[in-house]
Regions:
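Acidic/histidine-rich alpha-helical segments that form the ligand environment
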Residues: 41-83, 93-99
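Short, contiguous alpha-helical
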Residues: 1-41, 83-123
Length: 123
């Protein structure tokens, strides 16, 4: 069975924002928010209906989006490069396109999950 949930998607997107903008583009050694060597899917597996977990997830996502926005604002050259885990270089423009793809994919997941919960369909 899948562990996908709306909260898991929020946590996952906080992880994705952090990975691409802090770790890859800014070169920070920022710790993972949820992932561990034992559980690469901790962003989904740890998404439980606890108000503190929900609040932390939204706070983390907002913080990571704010960092990404500030990074992009300070980096006018879209050909600026960052280094991925495997040592390859990636340009900021490619990261931005990738983030659009990530959000499009996961917003679609959220739309389907919402429909399963209450029958409402996206507009």
């Amino acid at each position: 069975p899948s562990t996908m949930s709306l909260l898991g998607l929020v946590r996952h997107m906080a992880h994705v924002e952090r990975s691409w903008f802090r770790r890859v583009m800014a070169g920070q050694d920022a710790p993972y928010l949820y992932r561990t060597p034992e559980d690469r899917d901790a962003d989904f597996n740890g998404a439980v209906a606890d108000p503190a977990v929900v609040e932390q997830a939204w706070r983390a996502w907002r913080d990571e989006v704010a960092f990404a926005e500030q990074y992009v604002d300070r980096t006018p050259d879209l050909s600026t490069t960052g280094t991925t885990r495997d040592g390859s270089e990636v340009q900021l423009r490619d990261v931005l396109v990738h983030m659009i793809e990530e959000y499009a994919r996961h917003c679609g997941h959220a739309d389907l999950l919402r429909e399963c919960i209450d029958g409402r369909v996206g507009q």
